Amino acid sequence: MLRVPKFLPRLARQAGVVPSHMSGASSMFRNLPGASNGISSQLRYKSGEVKGAVIGIDLGTTNSCLAVMEGKQAKVIENAEGARTTPSHVAFTKDGERLVGMPAKRQAVTNSANTFYATKRLIGRRFDDPEVKKDITNLSYKVVKASNGDAWVSSTDGKVYSPSQIGAFILMKMKETAEAYLNTPVKNAVVTVPAYFNDSQRQATKDAGQIAGLNVLRVINEPTAAALAYGMDKTEDKIIAVYDLGGGTFDISILEIQKGVFEVKSTNGDTLLGGEDFDNHIVNFLVAEFKKDSGIDIRKDNIAMQRLKEAAEKAKCELSSSQQTDINLPYLTMDAAGPQHMNLKLTRSKLESLVGDLIKRTIQPCQKALSDAEVSKSEIGEVLLVGGMTRMPKVQSTVQELFGRQPSRSVNPDEAVAVGAAVQGGVLAGDVTDVLLLDVTPLSLGIETLGGVFTRLISRNTTIPTKKSQVFSTASDGQTQVEIKVHQGEREMANDNKLLGSFTLVGIPPAPRGVPQIEVVFDIDANGIVHVSAKDKGTGKEQQIVIQSSGGLSKDEIENMIKKAEEYATADKQKRELIEIVNQGESIVHDTETKMEEFKSQLPAEECEKLKKEIADLRTLLANKETADLEEVRKATSSLQQSSLKLFELAYKKMSAERESNAGAGSSDSSSSSDTSGEAKKEEKN
């Protein structure tokens, strides 16, 4: 255990410095109008390492979005289905096929136990967390305790996946979409996370990018990204609030925009508050209403519950633009009396009463963010609404009451975060040179000291990157080692905060308590990820770690998941190639049979029989296309194509010869007729 020595006053011994390349950046840019040029040249210098396009990805709870810089503008890229956002769903079919996005969401009703959604709410979390336990009751798939204590998901065939893996499958889909659009391999990305994500969740998101084969250059906060999207083409200086209520999380950030410098003043939020919770409240209401009308509790009917969830989401969206909607679900379930249907009306006012407590939960974080930023609501020049839930009229009116002004609709709530991520990607690549982003750490960081007290080294809303140190000492006589327990949170006792990880500094020479001097250094990088070191100043012995969660993914686990992701990518490619060659084979069979019928009088019977056998052989292969060998199908298809071309070439030659023969005979007859006619005319003349 460590103690803060009395002879080393904490404030006197605490140093707060940013890395040399950022030193003084915050104050310098607040006071010097022309200073952005210095930063621009600095960013250009740093960008030399980044080669190729940098894509911006909003990895959302409900939907994900992708953007890339084209010149000075960010462009949202449509996926293969033609949509600008992709559902954050991953499913595994009975035959082992992996589906991502809309194809996965479409089959969720009939395959709910193997369709994974909203896994972002599990990422970087422990299975025993009370929040996870509460969430599990609303999920259609199984959540299990991994060997490291984290919350993982399990399919019906017993395979388990970490939330980082599921996130990686979605990121792989975004990567493929970008590569198809740019027509070049893509490696670099900026990925967004909720501002209130802790270190474990940020690290797990970065792991997801690594598993997907991406080099995640930066992890940035979603509200900050939205502010970048908003402020890219704005020239006036102002303080803005970003109210971000998405599918699974809520964030509020206060930023000051001044001559291209985006400085986050404060951030707050709730990582378990979003559209999923709104949907669950509606589902609970529908279940209760159905039980009241029919006497049937349908909670154990997975298909019925999945249909209710879809209906709840649809009704919620419709009530943003209309006062009332009908929920009609025929054949929802069966009982002894026969099929039971659901048919009820849901009004906007009823919806607002159902979710009123959820909307109220966003108020306190907003007030706290204003207080931490030392800004009054009258100083807020603009309030940006981000996230699909901000389309709800009640949410908009709550924001208006809270900030005393009409919220702005100048950014697309679904796309702004991805656009901002692309802008930051442009900054890192050196394509955007007039923007500097100064973000903050959302939660205080510190260590456990004598008596279980949480001693802060870095307070919340400190601009990052940052580095701070403090000297501690031993808590007992003759102590030769100390355990450094790193926590994150705002409570005064360490156990009430999130334990990020721990390590031990050994080899301290025995001495009376309070004599050894142990310097603990916290270093937070631009991604918000924590690096911690401890050094015995007497011996010079040092121990350092990059904080993973006390569970988290090990290097070996990440490498194994990368390998599995590559295997899935290979399998997907082979499956796609097989489908393409099967389609080609079926097309050639159809065309060959059509032409054989059309030219049967011109084709040798013996050759036709050979061709029919080849068609029959290929048909047999195509009938078992799920298990067919790709090369075998390709070979048979190519053989039939070559044989049919040769045969039809003979037919065309034969037809051509016949036409020429007929044309020659016709010409001879015409000439003979002409001569006879001439002789007759001569006789008449005579």
Swiss-Prot record:
The biased composition feature labelled Low complexity covers 667-677
Keywords of this entry: ATP-binding, Nucleotide-binding, Phosphoprotein, Stress response
The molecular function GO annotations come to: ATP binding; ATP hydrolysis activity; ATP-dependent protein folding chaperone; enzyme regulator activity; heat shock protein binding; mitochondrial protein-transporting ATPase activity; protein folding chaperone; unfolded protein binding
Region: Disordered; residue ranges are 657-686
Known InterPro entries for this protein? ATPase_NBD (IPR043129), Chaperone_DnaK (IPR012725), Heat_shock_70_CS (IPR018181), HSP70_C_sf (IPR029048), HSP70_peptide-bd_sf (IPR029047), Hsp_70_fam (IPR013126)
Listed GO CC annotations? cytoplasm; mitochondrial matrix; mitochondrion; PAM complex, Tim23 associated import motor
Source taxon at top rank: Eukaryota
Q: List the PANTHER family.
A: HEAT SHOCK PROTEIN 70KDA
| HAMAP family registered for this protein in UniProt | DnaK
What family does this chain come from, according to its entry? Belongs to the heat shock protein 70 family.
UniProt protein name: Heat shock 70 kDa protein cognate 5
Q: Which organism is it from?
A: Drosophila melanogaster
Provide the taxonomic classification.
Answer: Eukaryota, Metazoa, Ecdysozoa, Arthropoda, Hexapoda
Q: Identify the gene encoding this protein.
A: Hsc70-5
